[in-house]
Amino acid sequence: SVPSGAVMIPPMAMPDATFLGFASAIRRLVSVPVITVGRLGDPETAIRAVEDGSADFVALGRPLLADPAWVNKVLRGETVRMCIACNTCVDGMRLGERLQCLVNPVTGRERVFAEAERQGKTLPSGLRIAVVGAGPAGLSYAAAVSKGNTVTIFEKAAVAGGAFRLAGLAPKFQEVEANSMPLLRFIDRL
């Protein structure tokens, strides 16, 4: 049904670790490994779910679309690009469209990027590039062209993040705001 489909892949209005309580209850009743799902993209939440015995494994779907290096980054103690549970990826798939991710512009375009890399295609270097706007798109572009180039980002606001940052002020969009610290760390690496 539509209502159960909407909850099966919990959107940002649902709490982190949406189904962890169910997994924990099941784990106490069975003698086989239990995997839990649903809004476990925060590394601390995922690790705690296994360490406290609520589940034997955590399944990561959308978090790996947001950051394919999620597991390796967590193992190295690095900041991950957090899935904000906006379900852009899910909505597109349900419509038969190309997979997309609001926080990872490469998602759904991996083949294009891999093919360009395989062919040795590189961006021109030695350029002075101006990027207007310090939202996710502008920052992602700036990062993509920064190697060998001088990139200057122009942003009218005092803080980077664009409308993406402001979305966190809306009720039930707190994950967008939670993503602002990784966004600021990303900016620092440019």
Map each language-model feature to its residues.
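Flavin-dependent oxidoreductase catalytic cores
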Residues: 1-132, 136, 140-151, 159
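Beta1-alpha1 glycine-rich phosphate/pyrophosphate-binding loop at the start
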Residues: 131-190
